[in-house]
Protein backbone atom coordinates (compact mmCIF):
# COMPACT_ATOMS: atom_id res chain seq x y z
CA UNK A 1 0.00 0.00 0.00
CA UNK A 2 1.31 3.42 -0.94
CA UNK A 3 0.52 6.35 1.29
CA UNK A 4 -0.63 9.81 0.39
CA UNK A 5 -3.54 11.91 1.62
CA UNK A 6 -6.46 11.94 -0.81
CA UNK A 7 -7.34 15.18 -2.54
CA UNK A 8 -10.44 15.72 -0.40
CA UNK A 9 -8.68 15.20 2.93
CA UNK A 10 -8.81 18.17 5.24
CA UNK A 11 -5.38 18.46 6.78
CA UNK A 12 -6.40 20.81 9.55
CA UNK A 13 -5.95 21.02 13.27
CA UNK A 14 -9.53 21.48 14.42
CA UNK A 15 -11.76 19.17 16.44
CA UNK A 16 -15.53 19.41 16.80
CA UNK A 17 -16.15 18.35 20.38
CA UNK A 18 -19.86 17.78 19.85
CA UNK A 19 -19.79 16.28 16.34
CA UNK A 20 -21.50 13.10 17.54
CA UNK A 21 -25.16 13.48 18.51
CA UNK A 22 -25.54 9.96 19.91
CA UNK A 23 -25.90 9.81 23.69
CA UNK A 24 -26.09 6.72 25.87
CA UNK A 25 -29.39 7.96 27.28
CA UNK A 26 -30.94 7.60 23.81
CA UNK A 27 -29.76 4.04 23.14
CA UNK A 28 -32.43 1.66 21.84
CA UNK A 29 -30.98 -1.20 23.88
CA UNK A 30 -29.38 -0.51 27.25
CA UNK A 31 -27.71 -3.91 27.43
CA UNK A 32 -26.54 -3.72 23.83
CA UNK A 33 -25.01 -0.30 24.34
CA UNK A 34 -23.27 -1.27 27.57
CA UNK A 35 -21.61 -4.25 25.84
CA UNK A 36 -19.18 -1.72 24.37
CA UNK A 37 -17.79 -1.15 27.83
CA UNK A 38 -17.48 -4.71 29.14
CA UNK A 39 -13.69 -4.49 29.43
CA UNK A 40 -13.46 -1.81 32.16
CA UNK A 41 -16.49 -3.26 33.96
CA UNK A 42 -14.96 -6.74 33.97
CA UNK A 43 -11.62 -5.41 35.21
CA UNK A 44 -13.27 -3.48 38.04
CA UNK A 45 -15.40 -6.44 39.07
CA UNK A 46 -12.41 -8.78 38.98
CA UNK A 47 -10.59 -6.38 41.27
CA UNK A 48 -13.51 -6.41 43.71
CA UNK A 49 -14.54 -10.06 43.51
CA UNK A 50 -11.08 -11.57 43.21
CA UNK A 51 -11.41 -13.41 39.88
CA UNK A 52 -12.53 -12.95 36.30
CA UNK A 53 -14.87 -15.92 36.73
CA UNK A 54 -16.82 -14.18 39.48
CA UNK A 55 -16.65 -10.93 37.50
CA UNK A 56 -18.32 -12.66 34.56
CA UNK A 57 -21.08 -14.05 36.78
CA UNK A 58 -21.74 -10.59 38.19
CA UNK A 59 -21.80 -9.11 34.70
CA UNK A 60 -24.47 -11.61 33.70
CA UNK A 61 -26.64 -10.28 36.51
CA UNK A 62 -26.11 -6.67 35.48
CA UNK A 63 -26.75 -7.31 31.79
CA UNK A 64 -29.82 -9.38 32.62
CA UNK A 65 -31.21 -6.48 34.62
CA UNK A 66 -30.53 -4.06 31.76
CA UNK A 67 -32.28 -6.36 29.29
CA UNK A 68 -35.38 -6.38 31.49
CA UNK A 69 -35.45 -2.84 32.82
CA UNK A 70 -33.21 -0.77 30.57
CA UNK A 71 -31.48 2.24 32.10
CA UNK A 72 -34.64 3.13 34.02
CA UNK A 73 -34.91 6.26 36.11
CA UNK A 74 -31.12 6.52 36.40
CA UNK A 75 -30.78 7.40 32.71
CA UNK A 76 -29.01 10.70 33.21
CA UNK A 77 -25.58 12.22 33.67
CA UNK A 78 -22.42 10.27 32.86
CA UNK A 79 -22.51 6.66 31.74
CA UNK A 80 -19.39 5.84 33.74
CA UNK A 81 -21.19 6.95 36.90
CA UNK A 82 -24.23 4.83 36.05
CA UNK A 83 -22.01 1.82 35.44
CA UNK A 84 -19.97 2.16 38.62
CA UNK A 85 -23.23 2.11 40.58
CA UNK A 86 -24.23 -0.98 38.60
CA UNK A 87 -20.89 -2.60 39.37
CA UNK A 88 -21.37 -2.09 43.09
CA UNK A 89 -24.90 -3.48 42.91
CA UNK A 90 -24.12 -6.58 40.87
CA UNK A 91 -21.04 -7.37 42.97
CA UNK A 92 -23.25 -7.45 46.07
CA UNK A 93 -25.88 -9.48 44.23
CA UNK A 94 -23.31 -12.03 43.10
CA UNK A 95 -22.01 -12.47 46.65
CA UNK A 96 -25.59 -13.01 47.78
CA UNK A 97 -25.94 -15.91 45.34
CA UNK A 98 -23.00 -17.83 46.78
CA UNK A 99 -23.16 -20.21 49.73
CA UNK A 100 -22.28 -18.32 52.88
CA UNK A 101 -19.05 -20.27 53.28
CA UNK A 102 -17.87 -19.15 49.84
CA UNK A 103 -18.65 -15.48 50.26
CA UNK A 104 -15.86 -12.97 50.64
CA UNK A 105 -16.04 -9.64 52.35
CA UNK A 106 -16.50 -6.98 49.71
CA UNK A 107 -14.44 -3.83 49.89
CA UNK A 108 -16.32 -1.34 47.74
CA UNK A 109 -14.70 1.75 49.27
CA UNK A 110 -12.55 2.20 46.17
CA UNK A 111 -15.42 1.65 43.73
CA UNK A 112 -16.73 5.19 43.62
CA UNK A 113 -17.57 7.78 40.99
CA UNK A 114 -14.15 9.38 41.38
CA UNK A 115 -12.13 6.19 41.90
CA UNK A 116 -8.72 6.50 40.25
CA UNK A 117 -8.77 2.82 39.35
CA UNK A 118 -12.19 3.02 37.71
CA UNK A 119 -11.29 6.21 35.84
CA UNK A 120 -8.11 4.53 34.61
CA UNK A 121 -10.04 1.49 33.36
CA UNK A 122 -12.60 3.77 31.71
CA UNK A 123 -9.98 5.95 30.04
CA UNK A 124 -8.17 2.94 28.61
CA UNK A 125 -11.43 1.63 27.18
CA UNK A 126 -12.29 4.90 25.42
CA UNK A 127 -8.76 5.24 24.05
CA UNK A 128 -8.84 1.66 22.78
CA UNK A 129 -12.14 2.31 21.03
CA UNK A 130 -10.68 5.45 19.42
CA UNK A 131 -7.62 3.52 18.24
CA UNK A 132 -9.82 0.83 16.69
CA UNK A 133 -11.90 3.49 14.95
CA UNK A 134 -8.71 5.06 13.60
CA UNK A 135 -7.60 1.67 12.31
CA UNK A 136 -10.96 1.16 10.58
CA UNK A 137 -10.55 4.57 8.94
CA UNK A 138 -7.19 3.48 7.55
CA UNK A 139 -8.66 0.25 6.20
CA UNK A 140 -11.31 2.19 4.31
CA UNK A 141 -8.88 4.89 3.10
CA UNK A 142 -5.86 3.11 1.65
CA UNK A 143 -4.02 6.34 0.93
CA UNK A 144 -4.37 7.63 4.50
CA UNK A 145 -2.40 5.32 6.83
CA UNK A 146 -3.34 7.42 9.83
CA UNK A 147 -3.35 4.49 12.25
CA UNK A 148 0.04 3.16 11.16
CA UNK A 149 1.66 6.59 11.30
CA UNK A 150 0.22 7.63 14.66
CA UNK A 151 0.84 4.20 16.18
CA UNK A 152 4.51 4.35 15.23
CA UNK A 153 4.89 7.98 16.30
CA UNK A 154 3.25 7.28 19.66
CA UNK A 155 5.46 4.26 20.31
CA UNK A 156 8.58 6.41 19.82
CA UNK A 157 7.90 10.13 20.06
CA UNK A 158 11.57 10.99 19.54
CA UNK A 159 11.96 9.08 16.27
CA UNK A 160 12.70 11.05 13.11
CA UNK A 161 10.42 10.89 10.10
CA UNK A 162 12.95 8.67 8.31
CA UNK A 163 13.03 6.22 11.22
CA UNK A 164 9.23 6.20 11.41
CA UNK A 165 8.97 5.58 7.66
CA UNK A 166 11.26 2.55 7.91
CA UNK A 167 9.37 1.20 10.90
CA UNK A 168 5.98 1.64 9.23
CA UNK A 169 7.18 -0.10 6.08
CA UNK A 170 8.45 -3.02 8.16
CA UNK A 171 5.59 -3.37 10.66
CA UNK A 172 2.58 -2.38 8.57
CA UNK A 173 3.72 -2.95 4.99
CA UNK A 174 2.94 0.65 4.06
CA UNK A 175 5.18 2.28 1.47
CA UNK A 176 5.76 5.73 2.86
CA UNK A 177 8.53 8.32 3.01
CA UNK A 178 9.41 11.03 5.51
CA UNK A 179 7.66 13.81 3.59
CA UNK A 180 4.41 11.84 3.53
CA UNK A 181 4.68 11.19 7.25
CA UNK A 182 5.02 14.92 7.92
CA UNK A 183 1.79 15.48 5.98
CA UNK A 184 -0.18 12.58 7.43
CA UNK A 185 0.84 12.87 11.09
CA UNK A 186 -1.09 16.14 11.74
CA UNK A 187 -4.17 14.58 10.11
CA UNK A 188 -3.77 11.44 12.21
CA UNK A 189 -3.47 13.40 15.44
CA UNK A 190 -6.49 15.56 14.66
CA UNK A 191 -8.58 12.56 13.60
CA UNK A 192 -7.61 10.58 16.70
CA UNK A 193 -8.57 13.50 18.94
CA UNK A 194 -11.87 13.79 17.08
CA UNK A 195 -12.57 10.10 17.62
CA UNK A 196 -11.82 10.46 21.33
CA UNK A 197 -14.25 13.38 21.53
CA UNK A 198 -16.90 11.31 19.74
CA UNK A 199 -16.42 8.50 22.25
CA UNK A 200 -16.71 10.89 25.19
CA UNK A 201 -19.87 12.52 23.83
CA UNK A 202 -21.66 9.18 23.65
CA UNK A 203 -21.05 8.62 27.37
CA UNK A 204 -22.59 11.95 28.44
CA UNK A 205 -26.17 13.18 28.54
CA UNK A 206 -26.83 15.91 25.94
CA UNK A 207 -23.40 17.44 26.56
CA UNK A 208 -22.29 20.95 25.69
CA UNK A 209 -18.81 21.71 24.40
CA UNK A 210 -17.83 22.69 27.94
CA UNK A 211 -19.13 19.37 29.30
CA UNK A 212 -17.00 17.41 26.83
CA UNK A 213 -13.93 19.49 27.65
CA UNK A 214 -14.47 18.89 31.34
CA UNK A 215 -14.84 15.13 30.89
CA UNK A 216 -11.75 14.90 28.68
CA UNK A 217 -9.78 16.71 31.37
CA UNK A 218 -11.25 14.56 34.16
CA UNK A 219 -10.23 11.41 32.30
CA UNK A 220 -6.68 12.64 31.76
CA UNK A 221 -6.90 12.74 27.96
CA UNK A 222 -6.30 16.46 27.36
CA UNK A 223 -2.82 15.78 25.96
CA UNK A 224 -4.38 14.24 22.84
CA UNK A 225 -5.86 17.67 22.03
CA UNK A 226 -2.65 19.64 22.54
CA UNK A 227 -2.06 22.06 19.68
CA UNK A 228 -5.52 21.51 18.22
CA UNK A 229 -8.36 23.99 17.93
CA UNK A 230 -11.42 22.76 19.82
Where do the language-model regions lie?
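Intrinsic, short, N-terminal disordered tails of RNA polymerase sigma-factor systems
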Residues: 1-230
Amino acid sequence: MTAGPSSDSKLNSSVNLVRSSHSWTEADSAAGFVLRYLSPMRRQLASVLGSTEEADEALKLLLGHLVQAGFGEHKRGRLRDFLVRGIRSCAKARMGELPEADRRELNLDGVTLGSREWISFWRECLLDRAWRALERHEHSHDDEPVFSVLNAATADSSATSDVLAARIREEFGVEIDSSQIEKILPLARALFAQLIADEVVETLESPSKADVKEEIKALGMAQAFSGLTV
